[in-house]
């Protein structure tokens, strides 16, 4: 089992020193979903939510969140991200919205947390924008789908 890189010999939390690591291409993809009543999904699809464009706002919130991950997660490094893509897809089978994020960087550390943060905040934004219609919505299934680059190599999640 790999050691925890954010803990020193005494068990205290520390930001990992990446100053000696080479900048390499790194990518991460994450997913999540927000499950809601069919009527709530219909409001979103038809553009009838009182707060406006739910999916567009959630997409932008996810992008902004990826860029601010270092402000939200204490031991994350600030990164010069080269790409953040957030997709919000209505899914009647849930019913709800499936959200995915892809983040890229040319840097000394990975972007898994940025992808996960983008999905999380996009889901929270959907909740915020339609909570007046459906307070029983559930955010679920947030996970890393895949990552590539860096010393630890590639990772792909088992199919759900």
Curated annotation (Swiss-Prot):
CDD domains registered for this protein in UniProt: MoaC_PE (cd01420)
Membrane-spanning segments: none
Pathway where this protein functions: Cofactor biosynthesis; molybdopterin biosynthesis
Reaction(s) catalysed (UniProt annotation): (8S)-3',8-cyclo-7,8-dihydroguanosine 5'-triphosphate = cyclic pyranopterin phosphate + diphosphate
Keyword Lyase annotated: yes
Root EC class: lyase
Residues forming the catalytic site: 128
Subunit structure: Homohexamer; trimer of dimers.
Functional note: Catalyzes the conversion of (8S)-3',8-cyclo-7,8-dihydroguanosine 5'-triphosphate to cyclic pyranopterin monophosphate (cPMP).
Designated name of the protein: Cyclic pyranopterin monophosphate synthase
């Amino acid at each position: 089992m790999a050691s925890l890189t954010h803990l020193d010999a005494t068990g205290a939390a520390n930001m990992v020193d990446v100053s000696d690591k080479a900048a390499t291409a790194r990518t991460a993809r994450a997913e999540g979903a927000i499950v809601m009543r069919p009527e709530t999904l219909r409001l979103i699809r038809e553009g009838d939510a009182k707060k406006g464009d739910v999916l567009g706002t959630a997409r932008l919130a996810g992008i902004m969140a990826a860029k601010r991950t270092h402000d939200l997660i204490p031991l994350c490094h600030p990164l010069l991200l080269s790409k953040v893509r957030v997709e919000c897809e209505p899914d009647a089978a849930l019913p709800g919205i499936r959200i995915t994020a892809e983040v890229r960087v040319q840097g000394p550390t990975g972007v898994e947390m940025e992808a996960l943060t983008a999905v999380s905040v996009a889901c929270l934004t959907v909740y915020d924008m339609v909570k007046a219609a459906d307070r029983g919505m559930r955010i679920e299934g947030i996970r890393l789908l895949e990552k590539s680059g860096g010393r630890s190599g590639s990772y792909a999640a088992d199919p759900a």
